[in-house]
Design a protein with these regions (language model features):
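C-terminal "cap" of GNAT-fold acetyltransferases
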Residues: 82, 145-177
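Conserved beta-strand-loop-alpha-helix junction that forms the acyl-donor binding cleft
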Residues: 93, 119-129
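Acetyl-CoA-dependent GNAT
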Residues: 10, 24, 29-91, 102-103, ...
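Conserved acetyl-CoA-binding loop-helix of GNAT-fold acetyltransferases
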Residues: 94-107, 111, 130-134
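Short aromatic/hydrophobic contact patches that present stacked aromatics
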Residues: 4, 83-87, 118-120, 159-161
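A short beta-loop-alpha structural element at the N-terminal edge
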Residues: 4-18, 163
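Conserved catalytic-core motifs of GNAT/GCN5-like acyltransferases
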Residues: 118-121, 133, 138-155
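Conserved GNAT acetyl-CoA-binding A-motif
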Residues: 109-121
Length: 177
């Protein structure tokens, strides 16, 4: 299975809607907004134009199979922190696509000079948690009953963080760049 990773463009709107609608609702809960709604995609694209979100997509034969975003607030007290959001099609999980998207987002974060990255996911998304931890993220918090699906069921949210500066310093000290 091959794919191309590139920047999310305005004309990718319909493909993103189709991709989001192909995912189970549970996979979208950590986002805070329902990507299956056109106005949410439009707001996302507006945030890209404003420079608050950098977004990458993975496409295969014209279909989206994954997405990664780096959400920042350059005007806040936490301008040094970026929030990473990752979505991978169910049939592409465990094959390296998520890792490739995250590594591409790491490069974007480095270009912005970010010191810390965070990621949120429901606590039962064990594959996602394992992937993020394999790339240096560590659990920092668990928010009980933080998100609620349309079925009314609440879910706990895990907050993971990656200290970019500490990892960079450790890598330099051990001769890894």
């Amino acid at each position: 299975m091959s794919y191309t990773i590139r920047r999310f463009q305005p004309d990718d709107r319909d493909a993103m809607l189709a991709f989001a609608r192909s995912l189970p609702e549970h996979d979208l809960l950590f986002l805070g907004r329902d990507l299956r709604r056109p106005r949410v995609i439009e707001a996302w694209q507006g945030a890209i134009v404003e420079g608050r979100i950098d977004s990458l997509i993975a496409s295969d034969g014209g279909s989206l199979v994954g997405s990664a975003a780096l959400v920042r607030d350059p005007l806040s007290w936490s301008a040094h922190v970026g929030e990473v959001r990752l979505l991978v099609a169910g049939d592409r999980r465990g094959a390296g696509l998520g890792r490739d998207l995250l590594e591409a987002i790491f490069a974007v974060a480095a270009a912005h000079g970010l010191a810390k990255l965070t990621a949120a996911m429901t606590t039962d998304q064990l594959g996602s948690i394992a992937l993020f931890e394999s790339l240096g993220f560590r659990a920092e918090a668990m928010l009980k009953d933080q998100v609620r699906g349309r079925d009314g069921v609440t879910h706990d949210l895990a907050i993971l963080a990656h200290d970019v500066e500490r990892t960079t310093q450790r890598n330099r000290a051990s001769g890894v760049e």
